[in-house]
Amino acid sequence: MMRRTLYPEIEPYETGFLEVDEPHHLYWEQSGNPDGVPVVFLHGGPGAGAVPAHRRFFDPRHYRIVIFDQRGAGRSTPLGDLTRNTTADLVADTEKLRTHLGIDRWFVFGGSWGSSLALAYGEAHPDRCRALILRGIFLCRKDEIDWFMTGMRRLFPEAWSEFANYLPAEERGDLLHNYHRRLIDPNPEVHLPAARAWSRYEGSCSTLRPNPDAVTSFLEPATALGLARIEAHYFVNDCFMPEGALLENVGRLEGVPGVIVQGRYDAVCPVVSAVELAEVWRGARLQIVTDAGHSAMEPGIRSELIATMERFKSIDDT
C-alpha cells in the first residue's frame, strides 16, 4: 500500500548559509539520504519561510531533501529585507544553491508562491528539473492578487472585515498600498501590528475547516513580518513579471513531468488557476482534492503530495 502519511521528524545532516547579493545570506539545509535523489522544497509566501515539518513529505531513505529560506524569509538574513528581492533574484538563488551543493538535477516541490517560483525556475532551467510537484497554484496575475486582497471576503467575510478594518476608513479603498506603506515602515510599532493583521487574514483563509493552530503559526513575529512585508512587496510590483508570463512560457517545460495538487475549495489560490495551467502544460497531471482548501497540511492535500513523491521513487531517471 502506498504511503500517504507524513514521515517521522528528522534533523538535517548539514546546514549552512549561502551568500548571494548583499545584504542577503540564505539559510539552507539538507536532510534524509546524502546519496539519495535530490528534491528541493520551495516555500510559499513569498516570505513565509520553511519549517521542520516540510522535511516530512519525503522518504528520508530515498530522497536528499534540500530546503532553504528565500531572501528575507525565515532563518535567512536580514529578515524582511527587500533589497534586490525579486522573482528573478530568487530563481538565480535557487540555481546557485543547486550548483553550490553539487546537484545535477533535482525534483522541484513548491506550493502557493512556491508553485510560482517552481514554475519560474523550471521555465528558466528545465534541464535541471526531474519533475515539478506543485500545490495551490498561483500564477502571479493581477486578478489573483485582487482576489487575495478583496475577493476572499466572499468566502471569509469575517476574516476580511478584520483585515480591512485594521486600516482607517479612509484607507480601505486601497488595501494593498496602504498595508504596504505600513509594512515597509522601519518602526516596529508600525510594521509589526500590520504584519500580524495581514498574516492572520491569510492564515484564517487557508484551511477548509477552522484551524486555530494554523492561524497562530502565522502570527509569530518573524513569520508575520517576513510573510506580510515580502508578500506586499511582490504584490505591489506585480510579482516582478509581465502579466501572464508563467502561463505563456509553459512551453519551455516541454519534456518536464509535472503533478499539480489542488484543493477544490482553495480560497487563497482558487482552483481555476490550476485548471488553466494543466490545460497548457502537456506534461502535467492535475489532481483536484475534493475536500480541501489551500494549506499543504490539509489532510487530503498532504496525502496526495506524499503519494506523489512515493510514485516518483519508482522512476529510474538519472
Placement of each model-derived feature along the sequence:
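N-terminal cap/lid segment of alpha/beta-hydrolase-fold proteins
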Residues: 4-26, 231
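Conserved HGGG/HGGXW glycine-rich cap/lid loop of the alpha/beta-hydrolase fold
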Residues: 19-78
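Conserved acidic catalytic loop of the alpha/beta-hydrolase fold
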Residues: 88-106
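Conserved hydrolase catalytic core segment
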Residues: 104-143
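A catalytic-pocket lid/entrance helix-loop region that shapes and gates access to the active site
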Residues: 127-179
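Conserved alpha/beta-hydrolase "acid-adjacent" motif
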Residues: 242, 267-273
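Short beta-strand/loop motif that positions the catalytic acidic residue
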Residues: 253-254, 260-262
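Catalytic active-site module of serine/aspartate enzymes centered on a nucleophile-bearing elbow/loop
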Residues: 284-318
